[in-house]
Amino acid sequence: NEFWKRTAKFWMKLFGINFAIGVATGLILEFEFGTNWSNYSWFVGDIFGAPLAIEGILAFFMEATFIAVMFFGWEKVSKRFHLASTWLTGLGATISAWWILVANAWMQHPVGMEFNPDTVRNEMVDFWAVATSPVAVNKFFHTVLSGWVLGGVFVVGIGCWYLLKKRNREFALASIKIGAIFGLVASLLSVWTGDGSGYQIAQTQPMKLAAVEGLYEGGTNVGLVGIGMLNPEKKTYNDGKEPFLFRIEIPSMLSFLAERDANAYVPGITNIIEGGYQQKDGTIALSAAEKIERGKTAIGALAAYRAAKSAGNEEDAQVAYKVLQENIPYFGYGYIKDVNQLVPNVPLNFYAFRVMVILGGYFILFFIVVLFFIYKKDLSKMRWMHWVALLTIPLAYIAGQAGWVVAECGRQPWAIRDLLPTSAAISKLDVGSVQTTFFIFLFLFTVMLIAEIGIMIRAIKKGPEV
């Protein structure tokens, strides 16, 4: 069918432009681990490097091979092989996302490793625990589905641009229909994965959950803040100021989402810092001050172990090793100087989360309205809807970035939760060097972004092949 062939070629061209930029920026990102994050690379390179290596060897080469056939194989290979190459390109991109998100999830919830005091490195002991972590699985589905939502919004928006310009009507309506159906399904599924993300955060990163909700004092039957404004004067968890100027809550909803029990206890920022509450495993939560002391003990025990080993004193080495093993879960806390460092930026996380959720709800409504107009009305005549669709494109990018703000800023101060704070993960570089390279890459990435947008606009203006 020539119509669908032209349609596929057009969207393939836009995909290829984004793919090229993704490869260019991704390669630069790989080098950053050695240049800017050398302590991190040494401390956990044995674990973090494995999924990235698999991503590069398996997924990237798979994409690179079959994308060439997908683009240049028209009329040169059989239709079945070309179709298979197209699907394998998409599969390769999905596998690539899996291993990248496995690495990211491990930073948020480190599992499957042991600390080796002889090398001062964490070493992998259970690959499958890392690769199939519940945090990784949920993060993968939520991230990929969010990407599909963005793709659906993009296709609908560009299709509406053609309708606005009164061009390629048949192509535009067919693309809009597919984009809206695909986007709606992905949007609805992302609600489910988003709920799973909230549950996983509650189990593994309670401080992030508390920051996202602006929850300072926990309790049972905790409500979910639907609408609220934080008090800008509240600077620390214990300054006595009210956290909100106003808020509207859904009663008991946070307890239900976090623990699947409306009566469950959810700790707040103050509770996590001060400790003393009963955790799900029945143990009493340690205070942040106690964790910091145990972290310092672990760091001291590591130094004592290495000194004893160097001196050939096995007895002292074993004593130090035992102390280290008892306190290793708190190793990263030894680098924390003030308990307030353990609290993420509450306003940033609180508002970013709500931007993501509100836009996610808007996308569901948007796709439903678009499909209604396609099947029940004449969408090609609704200019106001064309403008709405165009303006929705940047909102999809904003929603995705808001989600990553919560994911990455919500876990601060940790590069690896409880094991390595961000401040200790960096390379020993002077400020001037970091600033110089930052602005160089900022300039390069800005140029690449401008080039990408320019090339895409030209391709869109040209339209599908006639």
What are these regions (language model features)?
Residues 1-466:
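Polytopic transmembrane helical bundles with strong interfacial aromatic enrichment
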